[in-house]
Amino acid sequence: MLVGASVGAAGWFSSQNSEHEGLLAAHEEARQAACAYAPVLADYDAKNLDAYFAKVLDGATGDWRKQFDDTSRELREVLTQGEVVSKADDVQCAIKTGDETSAEAIVVIGQTITSVGTQGKPSPGQLSMIMRMEKTDGRWLVNHVNSPLASVPQQ
């Protein structure tokens, strides 16, 4: 009877360990996807916005895809008028919470912006956000972005 209990306990602990390892692997995949997507958001040139918009939408799904798509015309106008060029310098990411198919990533992007407003001189800055990641068809995509700069005023 003791042997049976030991085998049963070993099996239970083994399954718990496998679930934990699966969760850790999913968190790491989500973190890597968020870190890969951050420069996509922060690297753009007003002279080549079609490629920028395509890359952003390629990594987007759900609410974020709709929000970005809905505001892209206004964003294009502002970036073009301001002759804005942005480059991501450093990206830091961590997973706040999540499971095997969704996660919240805290993302901090160091960026340098050059524009009419900076008189053509590079100006360093930092952008922080929370990305809601969702695993869709085997890919981690961004479903929601919470950032002061990503807020859209309600009309």
Model-predicted regions and their roles:
Residues M1-D43:
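Juxtamembrane and targeting peptides
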Residues A25-V85:
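Core segments of small alpha/beta cavity-forming domains
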Residues S72, V107-Q111, N146:
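A mature extracytoplasmic/lumenal domain signature
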Residues G82-G117:
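Surface-exposed, charged secondary-structure patches
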Residues D90, E100-S102, P124-S128, D137:
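Extracytoplasmic
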Residues T114-Q126, I130:
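Periplasmic/lumenal scaffold domains of single-pass inner-membrane subunits
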Residues Q126-Q154:
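Short beta-strand edge/turn micro-motifs at domain boundaries
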